[in-house]
Amino acid sequence: MQSTEPWSPSWGTLSWDYSGSGSLDQVELCPAWNLPYGHAIIPALYLAAFAVGLPGNAFVVWLLSRQRGPRRLVDTFVLHLAAADLGFVLTLPLWAAAEARGGLWPFGDGLCKVSSFALAVTRCAGALLLAGMSVDRYLAVGRPLSARPLRSARCVRAVCGAAWAAAFLAGLPALLYRGLQPSLDGVGSQCAEEPWEALQGVGLLLLLLTFALPLAVTLICYWRVSRRLPRVGRARSNSLRIIFTVESVFVGCWLPFGVLRSLFHLARLQALPLPCSLLLALRWGLTVTTCLAFVNSSANPVIYLLLDRSFRARARFGLCARAGRQVRRISSASSLSRDDSSVFRGRSPKVNSASATW
């Protein structure tokens, strides 16, 4: 995963970007003007996402990791997903500072590599974990009996471990081939990948394997489960809708970026010849969609807070001095299946079972 791309108003300036920078052939010959006011708007968006995502995801991790007794299956997925989002948002101040300086990276080569690697790993892990959670929800609703052997705590931990392992492998190119690259105008250095054409093919392949494929799995499971929503109970239906909201927001935030990123890879490989006007529009589109994708890292806690009364109750208790005793008194109310319940579902003195959707 790479940084967003702040393009210089000068001609032929080496660009760096989350969406794949460095100038090659046709792309190098086209002007790369900055998105108007991007140096002010983009850092503000990143810092806002950091301000929301850091405490929000940290609270979700704290809330789920301190649970006593057996952890429910979906709890494990959401815990790992929150951890991935937390790792993602921790890098946002660095990219915000670089964006504010017109794309010049002030933190040295080491932090450039580590931050790029962290973005790649956490983005990939998030996509794979959501795909795994989608499959689990489909099995819970569509195959509750036949899939019971697969829906065990051990299997879910193995799936999460495999997702992280795949994500770390997918992030290695960012660790190995990204670093400080001098801008062509000699003003400073930018955090960019090395301008090798072969890296574009690798990037496109990784995008297909770590984004397009998990996205397809998520959408198929979403469609299959949605067909069964009218036949499930109210509590299960509400729980599934919260999960679907999380997945839909992820798709809405990342799909535009994935499409434009693929087009940009193809353009840099000269497989998709584009005039300079369309290349500039593509670059600006990547800037906007990258911001949208980055903001997704702070979205899930907001979704839980808005849609789940039980989570709001637990959040209130968690912020109180007596949170420990009160949270331990929260009991399960309803479940998505007989052996699995949703993430923040519970009963508090002010939350009835109908509203405890997770």
Curated annotation (Swiss-Prot):
Extracellular-side stretches of the chain, per the record, are 1-43, 98-113, 177-200, 261-284
Where is it mainly found? membrane
**Statement: the UniProt record of this protein carries the keyword Transmembrane:** yes
Q: Where in the cell is it found?
A: Membrane
Q: How does it sit in the membrane?
A: Multi-pass membrane protein
Cytoplasmic membrane side: 65-76, 135-155, 222-239, 308-358
Pfam families listed in its UniProt record: 7tm_1
Q: What does this protein do?
A: Orphan receptor.
Q: Return the protein name.
A: Probable G-protein coupled receptor 25
- Species this chain originates from: Mus musculus
- The gene that this protein is the product of is Gpr25
